[in-house]
Amino acid sequence: MKKFLLSSSVLSANFSRLGEDIFDVLKSGSDMIHYDVMDNHYVKNLTFGPIVLESLRSVEKIKSMVIDVHLMTCPVDDLIIKFAKLDVNIISFHPESTNNVEKTIKLIKSYGCKVGLALNPLTPLCVLDNVLDKIDLILLMSVNPGFPGQKFIPSILNKIRIVRELIDKSKKNILLEVDGGINLSNIFKIASFGTDIFVIGSAIFNSINYDLTIRSFRDVLKNINCKK
């Protein structure tokens, strides 16, 4: 049975009670926390930095959470070091944000973190050609990065299918993560095209009952496994 993972994006959380929101979604069954870092240069928004995460890591009831960091910054290397020192689990970056993709991959690995390469909707898949054997995760953006609450771009489904085929053909243990506009109406289709990790923000944090919402996502994904 395929294991699907839910990564709750705190970009959609209530910032006035961020620690409590994170605790609540983890308690409700989220597998990890997706931590979007934006610098108002690479994308036109400004979000969290390492200081906020360091503070969250000090909260006893959530300090062991799995952290999936998505860097939408330029440059990235200095921030990679700061986040890696906070014992994050995954660090994903965009190939356009560095002068040397392979060097940045090595930097992340040198700190013992898993490496993700993040691709915007218009980023060509040829950027994967020389690094597929060096990364642990491919993060496909299914919205234009920068702001929460956007609608899923339908054409990304074909991109998911192609990347899934590339991963399977490589026979590498690479996870495929999709981020943007995922909800209860479209997660079945997104999963059926080969996604492993679903970054979900508004659909969880804007819901009244995290337990019920996350359970509903799990129920849909169970149906995928039943049909295989």
From Swiss-Prot:
Asked if the keyword 4Fe-4S belongs to this entry, the reply reads no
EC number of the protein: 5.1.3.1
Reaction equations catalysed: D-ribulose 5-phosphate = D-xylulose 5-phosphate
According to its UniProt record, what is one Pfam family this protein matches? Answer: Ribul_P_3_epim
GO molecular function: any one?
D-ribulose-phosphate 3-epimerase activity
What is written in the cofactor note of this entry? Binds 1 divalent metal cation per subunit.
Q: Any keyword Isomerase? A: yes
Question: In which residues is a divalent metal cation bound?
Answer: H34, D36, H70, D179
- Gene3D superfamilies for the chain: Aldolase class I
Keywords annotated in UniProt: Carbohydrate metabolism, Isomerase, Metal-binding
Residue positions binding substrate: S9, H70, G146, F147, P148, G149, D179, G180, G181, G201, S202
Q: Report the record's Gene Ontology biological process terms.
A: pentose catabolic process; pentose-phosphate shunt
On the tree of life, the source organism's domain of life is Bacteria
* InterPro entries assigned to the protein according to its UniProt record, in alphabetical order: Aldolase_TIM, Ribul_P_3_epim, Ribul_P_3_epim-like, RibuloseP-bd_barrel
The active site is formed by: D36, D179
Cofactor(s) recorded for this entry are:
a divalent metal cation
Name the pathway. Carbohydrate degradation
Function field: Catalyzes the reversible epimerization of D-ribulose 5-phosphate to D-xylulose 5-phosphate.
Protein family per UniProt? Belongs to the ribulose-phosphate 3-epimerase family.
- Read off the PANTHER family from this record: RIBULOSE-5-PHOSPHATE-3-EPIMERASE (PTHR11749)
Q: What is this protein called?
A: Ribulose-phosphate 3-epimerase
Which species does the entry assign this protein to?
Buchnera aphidicola subsp. Baizongia pistaciae (strain Bp)
